[in-house]
Amino acid sequence: MSVALADYFADVHSSDVFDYGFGSISDFLKVKPVVPYDWVIANPPFRLAEDFIDRSLKIARHGVAMLVRTVFIESVGRYERLFKTRAPAIFAQFTERVPMVKGRIDRKASTATGYA
């Protein structure tokens, strides 16, 4: 995602808790930002997505965009904790299924999972 985002943003910072050979190695939920961020754009682990959104809303000056499974928005508990007071401004559902293949693009891959 970072390479594509660099086509549109002057400064892109990338990190992950694992070394994928790109960006820094750090835990987004624990590290203190060294600079203020205009946007936080992420594909968080599903089980941590709510925490990522909470943290992102605190440190982003302009906006937050998350790539999550569509079912993320379907939880009553998540609605009460997250969306009731901070509803998404835009919910952009992918019209086709987007297979997530670790570290590569596989045009023959398929999935039953929807993403937004």
Where are the model-predicted features located?
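Class I S-adenosyl-L-methionine-dependent methyltransferase catalytic core
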Residues: 1-116
